[in-house]
């Protein structure tokens, strides 16, 4: 997943349509920030009358009046600060929400090979960290630019009005600072991209340990995982230091340049021609205080570049992800009243990460209501066949047809609606049992239909023992259930769909012997109405299949019924002999 090298302007132009619906909030916030800056500058400008009139002439009445003015200005400053903070938080929250929704939706439609090549930790970082970084960095930069920019302009106006002779020197440092900021812009963006990548790696490493903590404990892998995490976190630290160094160098340079301006003001104040211009103690205090006050916004404006570049770098990463092509769905066939005639014709397929084909010139047919079992050693290509039927992957050569129509001509939603899959890797959601069985279609099925599917999968045996029955929340990925119970819910989910094609990818592998026997009885009833592909490790579960295909290195080595294959005295009999004797 490569990031496009776009300029900051191009990136912001693309981000603007997401922000623009909330521009009223930005305008209100901008006005409030300007008022806030004017209030700050106003407080400094009050120093001249306070010193010259109030204290210099000991005017008690004037001092009393100024006390009310100071309270009013500070009150105005507080109100404007609240309004600007609230409006910007509202806009930022909206932008983060939209970005996260777009990324989440886009990821749901990405093809399976994309997830093979990108870790879930890295993708989670895109949804959480990068989306937040775009909004926070952009809003933070806006606050700095508008508020500090308005503050500097206000201070300049106060200085010029008070004593333009002392103030004129300040204009000399502006172009120098602008050149410096432009010089470091590109570097900040590059470093920020590296930080985002490191964050993705850090998240991925931590996620692997958390998901596989039982394996870590079982094999004593704590030291290995600690070293792996330490390496990734140290890499992130070093990249963070590079950003800190770039930031630390730019700030002192700006401040040194500004210090020369301050020194010049002090020196010019001693020049008689300037002192003759009615320069009072109040005037000098206002000019000098304004220049001191200007150091903070100048520093902030220097930092805003780094802050803004972080957001733009994150934005480029997210747009690069959004630009990736989603799953191809060019088919138009609706697939209504599918009978279930499935055919593989000279199918060859190779995974992107491998050189050797997973399937080679594979051909076989499955008639309606028939069961074909696929057996073979791990890595022979059995599960690949199941993935091709549902178009999780597309064939390189040949074709797969359903009812005589190429599956690529079907709409993806229609094809998958007609193919129910139960794999050895069961995934359940943190929801009720009923909603997991009727996943993505809970309004389509009645309570009675859900119960029937659960009974047919022999899941009601344990569901009825739970305190809340079908309404029991099972935790993330069914953490509160046993492996066999989770597998039965997955089978119930597939049965409820009542699809004409049923794919069982070692679906009974996690069941105990008694449960497996019950499931086999249920599946035998269903096989008369469905086209079934069974991928099995235990040969005892597929002895009654209409045809058994022995897959080896992506090719069909043997085919026939259970008895026919035993009579061949070949690979199937060897597998059978090994399992019987164990």
Swiss-Prot record:
Catalytic activity: ATP + H2O + lipid A-core oligosaccharideSide 1 = ADP + phosphate + lipid A-core oligosaccharideSide 2
Cell compartment(s), UniProt: Cell inner membrane
Keywords of this entry: ATP-binding, Cell inner membrane, Cell membrane, Lipid transport, Membrane, Nucleotide-binding, Translocase, Transmembrane, Transmembrane helix, Transport
UniProt topology in membrane: Multi-pass membrane protein
GO molecular function, one term: ABC-type oligopeptide transporter activity
Function summary: Involved in lipopolysaccharide (LPS) biosynthesis. Translocates lipid A-core from the inner to the outer leaflet of the inner membrane. Transmembrane domains (TMD) form a pore in the inner membrane and the ATP-binding domain (NBD) is responsible for energy generation.
Protein name: ATP-dependent lipid A-core flippase
């Amino acid at each position: 997943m490569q990031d496009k090298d776009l300029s900051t302007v191009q990136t912001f132009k693309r981000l603007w349509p997401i922000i623009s619906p909330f521009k009223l909030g930005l305008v209100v916030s901008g006005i409030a920030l300007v008022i806030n800056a004017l209030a700050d500058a106003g407080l400094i400008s009050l120093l001249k009358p306070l010193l010259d009139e109030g204290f210099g002439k000991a005017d008690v009445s004037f001092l009393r009046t100024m006390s009310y003015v100071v309270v009013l200005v500070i009150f105005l400053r507080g109100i404007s600060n609240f309004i600007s903070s609230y409006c910007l938080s509202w806009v930022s929250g909206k932008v983060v929400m939209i970005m996260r929704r777009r990324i989440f939706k886009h990821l749901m439609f990405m093809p399976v090979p994309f997830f093979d090549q990108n870790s879930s930790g890295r993708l989670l970082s895109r949804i959480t960290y990068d989306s937040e970084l775009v909004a926070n960095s952009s809003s933070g930069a806006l606050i700095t630019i508008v508020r500090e920019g308005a503050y500097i302009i206000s201070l300049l106006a106060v200085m010029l009005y008070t004593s333009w002779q002392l103030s004129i020197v300040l204009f000399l440092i502006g172009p120098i600072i602008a050149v410096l900021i432009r010089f470091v812009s590109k570097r900040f963006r590059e470093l920020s991209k590296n930080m985002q990548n490191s964050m993705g790696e850090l998240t991925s490493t931590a996620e692997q340990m958390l998901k596989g903590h039982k394996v870590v404990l079982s094999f004593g892998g704590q030291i290995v995982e600690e070293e792996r995490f330490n390496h990734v976190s140290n890499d992130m630290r070093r990249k963070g230091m590079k950003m800190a160094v770039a930031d630390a160098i730019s700030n002192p340079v700006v401040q040194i340049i500004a210090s020369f301006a301050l020194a010049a003001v002090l020196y010019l104040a001693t020049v008689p021609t300037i002192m003759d211009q009615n320069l009072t103690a109040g005037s000098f205090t206002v000019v000098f205080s304004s220049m001191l006050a200007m150091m903070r916004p100048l520093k902030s404006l220097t930092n805003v570049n780094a802050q803004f570049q972080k957001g733009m770098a994150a934005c480029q990463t997210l747009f690069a992800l959004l630009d990736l092509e989603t799953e191809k769905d060019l088919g138009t066939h609706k697939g209504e009243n599918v009978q279930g005639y499935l055919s593989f014709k000279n199918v060859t397929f190779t995974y992107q990460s491998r050189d050797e084909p997973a399937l080679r010139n594979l051909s076989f047919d499955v008639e309606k209501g028939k069961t074909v079992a696929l057996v073979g050693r791990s890595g022979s290509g059995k599960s690949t066949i199941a993935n091709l039927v549902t178009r999780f992957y597309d064939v390189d050569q040949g074709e797969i047809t359903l009812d005589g129509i190429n599956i690529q001509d079907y709409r993806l939603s229609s094809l998958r609606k007609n193919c129910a899959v139960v794999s050895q890797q069961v995934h359940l959601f943190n929801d009720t049992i009923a909603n997991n069985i009727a996943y993505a279609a809970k309004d389509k099925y009645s309570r009675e239909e859900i119960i029937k599917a659960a009974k047919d999968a022999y899941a009601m045996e344990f569901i009825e023992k739970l305190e809340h029955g079908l309404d029991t929340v099972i935790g993330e990925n069914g953490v509160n259930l046993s492996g066999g119970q989770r597998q039965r819910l997955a089978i119930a989910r597939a049965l409820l769909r009542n699809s004409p094609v049923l794919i069982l990818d070692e679906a009974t592998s996690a069941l105990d012997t008694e449960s497996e026997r019950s499931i086999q009885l249920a599946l035998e009833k269903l096989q008369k109405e469905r086209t079934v592909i069974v991928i099995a490790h235990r040969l005892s579960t597929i002895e009654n299949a209409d045809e058994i295909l022995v897959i080896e290195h992506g090719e069909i080595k043997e085919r026939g019924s259970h008895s026919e294959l035993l009579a061949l005295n070949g690979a199937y009999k060897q597998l059978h002999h090994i399992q019987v004797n164990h």
